[in-house]
């Protein structure tokens, strides 16, 4: 040890004798020039390699331990990940000083130091690799422990219960039908070729998935059935091939024809026939009703009902969903699922669009229930069935004539043939005798279907004249128009609304000649006796058959239109009228023909007015009432129109005359008649209305006719009342017979004050009308112009 210390000390001293140890001249294999030996020996760097070599040879254990300590310290401070990157750098750092060593060429101990450093580097590298392996293994163990329970849960979610499997089977069958329908419809439109090809690819992919699934599970379970292959998939693929091969549809552009905006795009006839007769389309509810059109993309976002029922919509933005929900929650929006959920916070039970069909139940739509078919198939069903019947009869006849029916002994082959026959029972191409109605028939009266039904209270009461009281006189010539006018009066309906107070409008009624009727002095007939002011009076227009023409000038007749009634004639189309009131129809008929008219109140020669009593009741009151002198019982038949029943006793002072007048009323009352026929006293008719609940307005009404001879010009006809729960309207074809000698001539004139008044005709006019013969009445009646202000005139 002392020698080594002395040698190390001498190495540090340049003047020491040991600096040249071993002497250069004693080195083996030294070929160095003696002149250069001094310079090499004098260099101070020659002592460092010697020291390192000595340390490396004798203290290898200490060096290894030192390197391990350094490595551990460095690992704790910097981490092993950084050490991996620094490894190559250390190697370079070690190599660089090794190349810069200025050692004598005679020294060969330099290789020992290099080997030592390489060994230490390899040891450190192995330690790094061990540490790397330890950490990932620990992480993997933790991850495996976490993943184990998750794998079990995922395995559970992949199992379908029987209900889910059944539902998935139905959805796959519907999916195949929809893909096939879209392919057929898109093939007919050249602009939809991408859609046609994509649907065909989807069907082929389903077949590919089914084959791979069967190949995977068949070795473990030979009875395995995949849901990728529904019962109609093979038929759909075969139908697509046959359609592209045998069916040709003209897709060339036709001549441009002016089309309306709402023109219905009908199905192609050939496609409609395939849709109706193929078993692939096993759900009739999913059949299309129109063809497909290629439309350019629109900026407006549309939502379908199926999208409203979804929980997640990836194809819509949050803004679009917000606007959609807001629009569906508006008050004017129809009832929908979103509004229902907002109100009740519950999801409604959604109905099934299609009924479940099992594979052994599938058949073409034409064999399904009729209520499940679309409109075009319902309309075309009779034609299809008739053509199929003819085809079956023809095939049966051919089979009987040729005798080619063969019996197959193999049951399996018979079954295959029967199935094949059932599939090919309908031809692929449309037969010539089949007429398909593919366009919907528009409703002729679409508004009437939505019109509110009339309540039973407002139903009209039909009134017919009594057959025993028909006119006994018929002139020699009866025109052809009389047959139409003598139609059953049950079709002549008069609508009576609720009692209102119309404004009294004086106007000439079109189609009504001047008033001159034998057998009575005045005619006033409120159809429903509406409530009116005392000064207002309603005059009822007479029918043309009751109107006789006068030879003398007749004052202008002003007739108010009944505001509470409206006449309708059968088979006559009425044009809408802006003004309220009745509308008479123009018709030219001879005067002697007697037609039933509306209800007529025969009043003796006087001026009367209608006084409203309230509650829909009215009273006929003379302007100047006279005191009756002697009572006389006269049978009266009155027909008053009111929704409720009420007795109407009439008290009337009449002017006595040689011929007793005829008054129409609902019951027999005592009417006082004056004894002096010359004095024309005024009539007073008081109507006391006592409303009786729950009774018909015309119960117990029996018309009574005064026993007197019927006039050839005017026959007595009383109405026959039919009971109904609604308000009884007045029939237009009611007649009132007036005796020839007991009638007065009255006309309605307009006074200066703007009111109506009944004035008697001159005595000469009355006598001329009384003395007129039936033959003189067969002349043509001059019609009143439609202008309400034009004067009505007639000539006998």
Curated annotation (Swiss-Prot):
Modified-residue entries (Phosphoserine), positions: 724
Comp. bias regions, Basic and acidic residues: 23-36
Listed Low complexity bias regions: 463-472
Key words, A-Z: Cytoplasm, Nucleus, Phosphoprotein, Transcription, Transcription regulation
Quaternary structure and interacting proteins, as annotated: Interacts with YY1. Interacts with MAD2L2. Interacts with INO80.
Function comment: Associates with the INO80 chromatin remodeling complex, which is responsible for transcriptional regulation, DNA repair, and replication. Enhances transcription activation by YY1. Plays a role in cell cycle regulation.
Name by which UniProt lists this protein: YY1-associated protein 1
């Amino acid at each position: 040890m002392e020698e080594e210390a002395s040698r190390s000390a001498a190495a540090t001293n340049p003047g020491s004798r040991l600096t040249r140890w071993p002497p250069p001249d004693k080195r083996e294999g030294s070929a160095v020039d003696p002149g250069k030996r001094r310079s090499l020996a004098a260099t101070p760097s020659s002592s460092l390699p010697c020291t390192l070599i000595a340390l490396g040879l004798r203290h290898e254990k200490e060096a290894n331990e030192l390197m391990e300590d350094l490595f551990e310290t460095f690992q704790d401070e910097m981490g092993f990940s950084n050490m991996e990157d620094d490894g190559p750098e250390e190697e370079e750092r070690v190599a660089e000083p090794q190349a810069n060593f200025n050692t004598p060429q005679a020294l060969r101990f330099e290789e020992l130091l290099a080997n030592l450093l390489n060994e230490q580097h390899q040891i450190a590298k192995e330690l790094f690799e061990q540490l790397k392996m330890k950490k990932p293994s620990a992480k993997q163990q933790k991850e495996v422990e976490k993943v184990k329970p998750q794998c079990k849960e995922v395995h559970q979610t992949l199992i379908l219960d029987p209900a889910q499997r059944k539902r998935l089977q139905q959805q796959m069958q519907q999916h195949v039908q929809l893909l096939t329908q879209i392919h057929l419809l898109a093939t007919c439109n050249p602009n939809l070729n991408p859609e046609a090809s994509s649907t065909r690819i989807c069907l082929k992919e389903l077949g590919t998935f089914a084959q791979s699934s069967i190949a995977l599970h068949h070795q473990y379970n030979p009875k395995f059935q995949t849901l990728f292959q529904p019962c109609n998939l093979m038929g759909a693929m075969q139908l697509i091939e046959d359609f592209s091969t045998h069916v040709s549809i003209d897709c060339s552009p036709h001549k441009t024809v002016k089309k309306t905006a709402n023109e219905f795009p009908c199905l192609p006839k050939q496609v409609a026939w395939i849709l109706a007769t193929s078993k692939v389309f096993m759900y009739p509810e999913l059949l299309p009703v129109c063809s497909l059109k290629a439309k350019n993309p629109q900026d407006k976002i549309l939502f379908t009902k199926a999208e409203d029922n979804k929980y997640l919509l990836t194809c819509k933005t949050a803004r679009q969903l917000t606007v959609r929900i807001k629009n569906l929650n508006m008050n004017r929006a129809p009832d929908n699922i979103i509004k229902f959920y907002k109100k009740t916070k519950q999801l409604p039970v959604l109905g099934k669009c299609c009924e479940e069909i099992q594979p052994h139940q599938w058949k073409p739509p034409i064999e399904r229930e009729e209520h499940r078919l679309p409109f075009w198939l319902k309309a075309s069903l009779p034609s299809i069935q008739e053509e199929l019947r003819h085809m079956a009869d023809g095939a049966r006849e051919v089979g009987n004539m040729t005798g080619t029916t063969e019996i197959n002994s193999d049951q399996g082959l018979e079954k295959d043939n029967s199935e094949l026959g059932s599939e090919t029972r309908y031809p692929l191409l449309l037969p010539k005798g089949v007429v398909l109605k593919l366009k919907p028939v528009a409703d002729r009266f679409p508004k009437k279907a939505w019109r509110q039904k009339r309540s039973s209270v407002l139903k009209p009461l039909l009134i017919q004249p009594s057959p025993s009281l028909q006119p006994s006189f018929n002139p020699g010539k009866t025109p052809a128009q009389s047959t139409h006018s003598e139609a059953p009066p049950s079709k002549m309906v008069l609508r009576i609304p609720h009692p209102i107070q119309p404004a009294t409008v004086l106007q000439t009624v079109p189609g009504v000649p001047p008033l001159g009727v034998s057998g009575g002095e005045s005619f006033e007939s409120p159809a429903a006796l509406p409530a009116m002011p005392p000064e207002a009076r309603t005059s009822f227009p007479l029918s043309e058959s009751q109107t006789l023409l006068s030879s003398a000038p007749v004052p202008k007749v002003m007739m108010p239109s009944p505001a509470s009634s409206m006449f309708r004639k059968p088979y006559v189309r009425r044009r809408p009228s802006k003004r309220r009131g009745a509308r008479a129809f123009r018709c030219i008929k001879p005067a002697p023909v007697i037609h039933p008219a509306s209800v007529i109140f025969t009043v003796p020669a006087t001026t009367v007015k209608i006084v409203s009593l309230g509650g829909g009741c009215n009273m006929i009151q003379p302007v100047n009432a006279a005191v009756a002198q002697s009572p006389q019982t006269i049978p009266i038949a009155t027909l008053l129109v009111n929704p409720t029943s009420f007795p109407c006793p009439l008290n009337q002072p009449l002017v006595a005359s040689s011929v007793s007048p005829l008054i129409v009323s609902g019951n027999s009352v005592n009417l006082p008649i004056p004894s002096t026929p010359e004095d024309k006293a005024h009539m007073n008719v008081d109507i006391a209305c006592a409303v009786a609940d729950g009774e018909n307005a015309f119960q117990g009404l029996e018309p009574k006719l005064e026993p007197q001879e019927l006039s050839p010009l005017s026959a007595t006809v009383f109405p026959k009342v039919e009971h109904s729960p609604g308000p009884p309207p007045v029939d237009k074809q009611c007649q009132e017979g007036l005796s020839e000698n007991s009638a007065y001539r009255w006309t309605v004139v307009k006074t200066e004050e703007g009111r109506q008044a009944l004035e008697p005709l001159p005595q000469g006019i009355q006598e001329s009308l009384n003395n007129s013969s039936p033959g003189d009445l067969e002349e043509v009646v001059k019609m009143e112009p439609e202008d309400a202000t034009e004067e009505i005139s007639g000539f006998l």
